[in-house]
Amino acid sequence: MPDRNGKIFYTSITSLSHISKVAGLTGSIGISLNDRELLSCDSKMIAGMLFGKIKQAEVANLHIELSLHGLFKKTVTPETEWIEAIGILLDNAIEASPKGSTIFLSSKKQGDFLELTVSNPAPPLSNTEFMALFGKGVTTKASRDGHGFGLYNILRMTERYHGKILTRNESILNENYVVFGVLMP
């Protein structure tokens, strides 16, 4: 019998039957927390880059945990600058982290600014030690060739856009993590 729109009711029952079958087949499939965070990211370029970094970390036997609670595209800072900062901070964390550990990347809105931080397990650093790492040509790597410009470039970016450098030590599950980040308009 047709409904008031002229459609036959049994097609709806058939569609519901198909939906139930599909739901039954996919019931055990879930979406990971990182995938959920990537899908919620307002910048598909940043989400794509983060996906690549997650895969890079997995190859190095590391885990990256994302917590994205800010809109990159709603800031004064261009997406390309965010991509550079995220890439530098994650590359440094991946290189410095012991195998099997977790790196945390977080973004959140702070008033008119977006705070981005990357945390990785490491011995505690003093404020002086943190800030010295942002000097031009300063590196912790054995080979100095072509190194020592990442954090310096982040410092220059914060100066260009009137942002701030964020550094601190943080205890996560009784382990020290060093936190590097930016607060950008």
PLM regions with names:
Residues 100-112:
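Short beta-strand/loop element within the Bergerat-fold HATPase_c
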Residues 93, 119-124:
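Glycine-rich acidic phosphate-binding loop
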Residues 38, 64-85:
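Conserved short strand/loop->alpha-helix "switch" segment adjacent to the catalytic nucleotide/phosphoryl-transfer site
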Residues 125-137:
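Short conserved segment of the HATPase_c
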Residues 38-60:
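Short beta-to-alpha transition helix within the HATPase_c
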Residues 3-6, 79-103, 160:
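Conserved ATP-binding N-box helix of the HATPase_c
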Residues 153-165:
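Conserved glycine-/histidine-rich ATP-lid loop and adjacent helix of the Bergerat-fold HATPase_c
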